[in-house]
C-alpha cells in the first residue's frame, strides 16, 4: 500500500470504530466521536482547539471548537464509550490473561478554574499538586508484548458522586467482569493491599495477585504473623534471571522464589504468599488465590505475572505521553471524563482494533521512526505506531469527513506483528 492508501484505510477504520462505540447513540454523537478520535490521533493532542484544527472545516475555527465542546458535554457519552471498549477488548481476554489495575493521576499544576480540582500525588515528580485521579485496567499476556486497554475513568474526591478510591477500583473490576466473566487474573500493586478490597475480591471469587505491604498480618499455621516476618523466614528453592528494560538499557536481576500457605484474618479461604528476593532490600511479597505447588514453573508463573508490570509500565504511560493528557484544557468535570474515555478508546484503537496488516503497513512506511525506538524503550511499537498514524493523517489532503468506514479484517486472518 502507498501512503495515500494507508491514510485512507486509517480514516475508514476510525469511522468504523467510532460507529461501533456509538451504536445506539444519535448520529451526531457518532460523528463527534469519529472527529475526536481523528483529531487526537492526527495531532497527538487532547486540546479541543487542536482537534478542531485537524478537521480543517470551511468555517471559523471558534465555531468548530464550540460545536465540539457542546458534543463533549453529552451526558454519559464517556460511560457508553467505556462500555463498548470493554466489550471489544473482552474478546481477547483468556483464562490466564493478566488484568492489571493501574491507578494514576492527571496533574494540572497551574489550573484554577477546572471543576472539582483535587489534591493528587504526581507520580512522575513525587509531589502533591492539583489534578484528578484515574483508574485503568489493561490486559496483558505473560508471553507476549501485546496489551489490551480495557477501561479508564477519571474521578475526583471533590466531586459530589465520589465515594472512595476503593469504590472506584471495585467499579472498574465489576464493569470489566461483566464482559470477561471469570476469565483473567487480576494484578495490583501495594495499593491493592486493603481489607476493603480483599473482602470483595474473595466474596466475588476473583483470581488475583496483589503485592503486600510488610505490615500486613496473615494467618500461618493457626497464628497471626507479619507478612514480612514470614517472607524473611521463607525457604527459597528456585531462582531465575529476569531482565528489566529501562531507557538507559537493560538491567539483569537474579531472583529467588518461595511460598507459604496462608489465610487472611477472619477469612477461611486458602491463599498463598509467594516471596521473591533479589529485586531490592526487602523481599517482594505477593498474595494470590492461584493454585500454587512446590515447583519452579508454578512459583515463577506468579512472580513473573506480577513482574510483567515492568514490561508494560512504559506502554501504560503511552497514552499520557503520546497524547499529552496532562495538557487537557476543558473546565467541566463531565467533559473531562468524556475526553479521558475517548483517549482510552484511541489507545485501544492503536493497540487492539487496527488489523495487524495495517500496523505493518504503518511501521513499514514509518521505519525510520520505529528504528529510533528499538533500543532501550520497551514495547516501542505503540509509540512508533502513534507517530506513524500522526504522520499519515497529518499528511493526508483528503478531509476526514470524506472518509468512509472500512470493513474490519477477520482477526484470524491478521498477521502477527
Predicted regions and their residues:
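Polybasic, low-complexity association/targeting segments
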Residues: 52-56, 265
Amino acid at each position: 500500500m502507498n501512503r495515500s492508501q494507508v491514510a485512507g484505510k486509517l480514516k475508514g477504520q476510525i469511522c468504523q470504530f467510532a460507529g461501533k462505540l456509538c451504536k445506539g447513540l444519535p448520529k451526531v454523537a457518532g460523528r463527534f466521536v469519529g472527529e475526536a478520535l481523528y483529531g487526537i490521533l492526527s495531532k497527538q493532542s487532547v486540546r479541543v482547539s487542536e482537534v478542531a484544527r485537524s478537521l480543517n472545516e470551511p468555517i471559523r475555527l471558534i465555531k468548530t471548537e464550540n460545536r465540539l465542546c457542546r458534543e463533549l458535554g453529552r451526558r454519559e457519552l464517556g460511560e457508553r464509550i467505556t462500555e463498548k471498549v470493554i466489550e471489544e477488548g473482552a474478546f481477547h481476554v483468556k483464562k490466564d490473561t493478566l488484568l492489571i489495575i493501574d491507578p494514576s493521576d492527571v496533574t494540572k499544576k497551574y489550573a484554577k478554574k477546572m471543576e472539582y480540582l483535587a489534591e493528587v500525588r504526581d507520580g512522575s515528580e513525587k509531589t502533591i499538586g492539583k489534578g484528578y485521579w484515574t483508574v485503568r485496567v489493561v490486559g496483558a499476556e505473560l508471553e507476549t508484548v501485546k496489551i489490551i486497554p480495557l477501561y479508564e475513568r477519571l474521578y475526583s474526591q471533590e466531586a459530589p458522586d465520589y465515594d472512595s478510591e476503593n469504590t472506584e477500583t471495585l467499579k472498574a473490576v465489576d464493569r470489566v467482569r461483566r464482559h470477561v466473566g471469570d476469565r483473567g487474573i487480576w494484578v495490583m500493586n501495594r495499593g491493592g493491599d486493603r481489607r476493603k478490597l480483599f473482602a470483595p475480591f474473595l466474596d466475588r471469587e476473583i483470581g488475583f495477585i496483589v503485592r503486600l505491604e510488610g505490615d500486613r498480618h496473615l494467618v500461618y499455621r493457626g497464628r497471626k504473623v507479619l507478612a514480612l516476618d514470614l517472607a524473611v523466614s521463607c525457604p527459597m528453592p528456585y531462582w531465575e534471571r529476569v531482565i528489566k528494560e529501562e531507557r538507559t538499557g537493560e538491567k539483569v536481576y537474579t531472583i529467588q522464589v518461595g511460598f507459604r500457605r496462608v489465610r487472611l484474618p477472619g477469612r477461611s479461604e486458602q491463599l498463598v504468599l509467594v516471596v521473591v528476593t533479589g529485586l531490592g532490600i526487602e523481599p517482594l511479597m505477593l498474595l494470590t488465590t492461584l493454585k500454587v505447588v512446590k515447583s519452579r514453573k508454578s512459583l515463577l508463573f506468579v512472580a513473573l505475572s506480577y513482574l510483567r508490570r515492568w514490561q508494560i509500565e512504559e506502554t501504560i504511560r503511552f497514552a499520557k505521553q503520546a497524547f499529552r493528557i496532562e495538557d487537557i484544557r476543558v473546565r467541566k468535570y463531565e467533559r473531562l471524563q468524556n475526553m479521558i474515555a475517548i483517549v482510552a478508546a484511541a489507545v485501544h484503537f492503536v493497540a487492539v482494533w487496527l488489523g495487524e496488516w495495517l500496523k505493518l503497513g504503518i511501521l513499514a512506511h514509518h521505519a525510520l521512526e520505529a528504528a529510533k525506538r528499538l533500543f532501550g524503550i520497551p514495547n516501542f511499537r505503540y509509540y512508533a505506531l502513534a507517530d506513524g498514524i500522526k504522520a499519515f493523517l497529518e499528511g493526508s489532503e483528503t478531509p476526514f469527513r470524506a472518509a468512509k468506514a472500512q470493513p474490519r479484517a477477520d482477526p484470524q486472518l491478521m498477521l502477527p506483528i
